[in-house]
């Protein structure tokens, strides 16, 4: 989600380009990193071509066989249409990249709905939909 705080000239040399001129999908390449889910027992191996941090908990819940919250179920469905999303943009299931504020995207309303849910989860102190974001405690 962020880069080390190094001099801009370092990135310019590394990329053979001016980092300030990178946009969209080119800028996205700077944030691409592999991930691994490790278990001390056999689990189904899977190669995930493209994902984002917001979906890692859905993969973990699936591998561990943990019951998902409504929110994790929502994210699981969302990742079918939009397998990767972040502050710069997102990819659809066909591999097409969209800038995050692209109002002509067929996914614009879906992204807007996701942003509202994220806001409610993070900042909705009085009106947070707790039953959606958390599992009920077992007695």
PLM regions with names:
Residues 2-139:
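Solvent-exposed soluble domains appended to multi-pass membrane proteins
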């Amino acid at each position: 989600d962020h880069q080390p705080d190094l001099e801009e000239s370092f990135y310019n040399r590394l990329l053979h380009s001016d980092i300030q001129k990178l946009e969209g999908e080119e800028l996205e390449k700077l944030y691409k990193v592999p991930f691994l889910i490790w278990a001390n027992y056999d689990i189904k191996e899977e190669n995930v071509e493209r994902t984002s941090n917001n979906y890692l908990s859905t993969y973990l819940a699936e591998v561990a066989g943990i019951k998902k919250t409504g929110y994790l179920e929502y994210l699981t469905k969302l990742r079918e249409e939009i397998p990767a999303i972040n502050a710069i943009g997102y990819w659809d299931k066909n591999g097409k990249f969209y800038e995050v504020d692209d109002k002509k995207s067929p996914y614009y309303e879906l992204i807007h709905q996701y942003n509202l849910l994220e806001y409610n989860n993070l900042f909705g102190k009085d009106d947070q939909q707790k039953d959606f974001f958390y599992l009920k405690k077992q007695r």
